[in-house]
Amino acid sequence: MSEFKSAVKNELKPVKYRHFNRGVNKYSNALHCQLRIGRSFLKSHSFSINFSQDDLCLCNRPETTSHFLLNCFLFQLERESLLAKICQLYPPFSRKSMQQQTFILLNGINLENEVPDARNVQIFYAVQKFILQTKRFSKTFSNLFI
């Protein structure tokens, strides 16, 4: 009976990744989570729920999560230190597609392993440090969009 319960539990209850609750602080962890689930105050997320008139960044490109994390020239300096840290932790990162890189920054690496990859905590710290350094979600930056 216990084997049956274990099999059902493994099938119906997804594995919880412990690194999702780690970060610089609760605020940065919340921002990171919002980016992961597509409900942040980026213009594309706000536009999708009619909270914004358009989905364009200040650089006139759609302000998506991948644009914010990997492309927007407004955050180039902050991004350089983020990518240096990520490439140090996970060297194959630079050879991944933009979609895969975005997934890694939002979710971590080696999620299919039973034993969590310890580098995910460091990846999350680096991403959250980037989010805070950009000040993209501060009230001052948000006022530029009004």
What is each PLM-predicted segment?
Residues 3, 19-146:
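Family-specific functional microsites
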